[in-house]
Every structure is written in structure tokens, then in C-alpha cells.
């Protein structure tokens, strides 16, 4: 009897030791994982496949990629071929692009939904929010309505080549600035700085998005004279560009939106920037991308800008779309944003809302089909 108990204890201890050993091995694998494994990892079974299959297919890379860091997903071998062996010459497929544009327009009237206009809302009208409970509302004030354009800022606009510039750290050292600035229209995301990074990201800006939370994060809600001056000077640099302000995504933006409205009314006529305030556009945009098997809690700003660009651009080139913490060309570590301070740790907070790797894979597939040019290598 005693021998049986001892045997059971020994068995349990053995299982515990094996589990600890596997955990230690996985941690070591994660730390020592070479970045090239991201590209050479074969297509393994789906997450629901038998665990032993994944061990057999390649324990180190699969365990580290699949279970320890969800931001790193196996990238297809075709990406390896294009970036590391023989960069292919991208060819624009106009027929496919026009077909996609038509598909998008069936779900989203981009011109109409690009911005609210004076004629599309009335004073006292209650606006709801795309990503908040229906109980939250924003009342259209006289000041807010006075800031709306008379017609959509992109009405009857057409541009040959457009650049949509994301904020990924892959732009660091890319020398893509001149190429971006040659575009006929440049979309930028989240009021990203350009001057100190112009060699990599360019200076030209025709449209930049402005999430109201930026006012809290970088301009202290305009609480001091210095904060207000800094914001004014930043806006002045935009000259006649469009400032696209998605004020109706979250109810938490309401107070900041009112602060913005007061500021723009106060400085009416002093700035050349064009204001655009989209209404509830996301329900339409989400519907299109859901048909492409992309349905995160929230789409990224970058893919939203691609959606808008499809309506006014004859050809779209993407820069700064890379959601991983290393450069695919040099394998050096990258910051999450190109403008992050040196030494800033790569963040994966976006996982709470976005599906950036899935978005990237879709965009890369579109690149291969000639729908859009996705720049991942250095430009010079």
C-alpha cells in the first residue's frame, strides 16, 4: 500500500517536473527565437488542431509565436521571397481596384459620409456614437454646426496616386519621405508629427485624422495658454489640409469635442485647415470589411483611411503598415510608432481592440493582387 502511494507521488512529481521543464524551455525559446523564424515558419495547423501536431511541426517557433506573443503570427513564405530573396516589381491591377471600389461604394457612400455638413444636421439634433451604448448622445450646438462644411470636402475630387501613411516603426530609417511627398494626395493618421522625421515619412499632408483623445494626451486639454499656443502652431503647419475629426466614435470624446469646438470658434478665420466631422460612418465601413472576414472590435485608422481613399484615388500606395516589433529587412527591433522615443518598448495594447496582424495579411494579399502597393522595404 505504502509503495503504491509512493509510486503515485513520484508520478505526480514527474508530471510537475515535466511541466516546469516545458515552461522553462518555452521561455528560453521565446527569448532566443531568431526573428527570421517569423518568416520561415511553415503553415501550421489551426489553433484548434491537436497540440502534438504543433510540437511535431516545430516546437520552438510555434510555441513562442502562437502562445507567448500573439502579436507575432506566422507570415507566409511569399513574404520571405519578396522581401529577402527577389523583390518583385509590383504591377497595378486597375480592373481589380475598380471592382473593389465599386464593392466599397455599395456599402459606404464615402463622399456623403466623409463629413457632416450644415445641411445634414440641425441645431439640437442628438447624435449617437458608433462604439458606445445607444443611451449616450451629443447635442448639435449652434457653434458645432457653424464649423461644418457646406458640402463634403472631397466632393468632385479625384487624385491619381495617393499615399496612405500609417505610423508603424517600420518607417524609421526607411528614407521614404521623398517618395511619399511625390504623391498627389497624402493621408496621415492621428495627427502624427512629420517635421523631425521628414526623411522617412515626408512633409506633405493633405488629410490627417484627429482623434479627440489627442487633445488630452498631447495638449493637456488646452488648459494653459502654452497648451493653446502649441496646438495653434501645430494646426497652422497643416495649412489647408483636412483635419478629419471622428468625434462620434466614443461617448468619452464628448467633453473634449466641446473643447475643440470652442477653440475653433475662437480662432475662426485664423487657420486655413479644413475641418471634417464624420457622423456614424463606421457601421457602413465595418460591413464591407466584415465581408472580407475582418471584424475586430475596431478597425485600425489606417484601413479606414484606405476605405476613404478608394473613393477619390485612382491608385493607392501604403506606407507604415507593419504591426510587428522588428524590421523585416534588417531584423532590427522597431518601436510601435516611428515617432516613439528611443528605447520605448513595443506595445501590444492594440490587441484589446484591433486585429492588426489579420489586417496586415489582408493588405498584403491585396498587394499581391495589384489592388494597392504595400511598401515594406526601404525606399532609398
Swiss-Prot record:
Glycans are attached at residues 93, 113, 206. Pathway: Protein modification; protein glycosylation. Residues 34-380 are lumenal. It catalyses: a ganglioside GM3 (d18:1(4E)) + CMP-N-acetyl-beta-neuraminate = a ganglioside GD3 (d18:1(4E)) + CMP + H(+); a ganglioside GM3 + CMP-N-acetyl-beta-neuraminate = a ganglioside GD3 + CMP + H(+); an N-acetyl-alpha-neuraminyl-(2->3)-beta-D-galactosyl derivative + CMP-N-acetyl-beta-neuraminate = an N-acetyl-alpha-neuraminyl-(2->8)-N-acetyl-alpha-neuraminyl-(2->3)-beta-D-galactosyl derivative + CMP + H(+); an N-acetyl-alpha-neuraminyl-(2->3)-beta-D-galactosyl-(1->4)-N-acetyl-beta-D-glucosaminyl derivative + CMP-N-acetyl-beta-neuraminate = an alpha-Neu5Ac-(2->8)-alpha-Neu5Ac-(2->3)-beta-D-Gal-(1->4)-beta-D-GlcNAc derivative + CMP + H(+). The active site is at residue 354. It holds the Pfam family Glyco_transf_29. Disulfide bonds join 162-313, 176-379. Homodimer. This is Alpha-N-acetylneuraminate alpha-2,8-sialyltransferase ST8SIA3.
